[in-house]
């Protein structure tokens, strides 16, 4: 992994493809990161953004390798705003999409049913979406 990072920093490669790892084995040998994404973030001193893509679809995740019990702690206005901005920057710079159109998913079933089964959509997700809309971004959600 470190050799791949070195080649990327030297601009000798355009990207890195990572393969599945057995986290237990790595942790037992001193690799104290839950996955490649977090390690790459630490090495680059940047917030990592995991993007999965194919010819028709590009998906970014707000969280990386964390237990489901910790997800709601990571769904904050600051994290969501930073993630969306990084994603917009990547879509524009890395993929040449001039005005990216982004859909933001809901956290709760049925987008929280207007607060009846979760308030994250009302208190966190929608205000951040509205903030990007005010900046002229094409963004939808929570979906």
PLM segments and residue spans:
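Anion-binding alpha/beta catalytic cores of soluble intermediary-metabolism enzymes, centered on
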Residues: 1-143
């Amino acid at each position: 992994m470190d050799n791949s990072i070195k080649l990327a920093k030297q601009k000798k490669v355009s990207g890195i493809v990572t393969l599945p790892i057995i986290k237990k084995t790595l942790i037992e040998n001193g690799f104290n990161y839950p996955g490649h994404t977090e390690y790459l973030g630490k090495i680059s001193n940047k917030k990592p953004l995991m993007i999965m893509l194919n010819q028709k679809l590009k998906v970014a995740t707000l969280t990386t390798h964390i237990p489901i019990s910790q997800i709601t702690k990571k769904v904050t206005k600051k994290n969501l705003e930073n993630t969306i901005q990084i994603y917009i920057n990547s879509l524009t710079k890395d993929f040449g999409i001039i005005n990216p159109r982004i859909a933001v998913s809901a956290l709760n079933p049925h987008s929280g049913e207007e607060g009846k089964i979760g308030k994250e959509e009302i208190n966190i997700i929608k205000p951040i979406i509205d903030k990007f809309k005010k900046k002229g971004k094409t963004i939808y959600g929570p979906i």
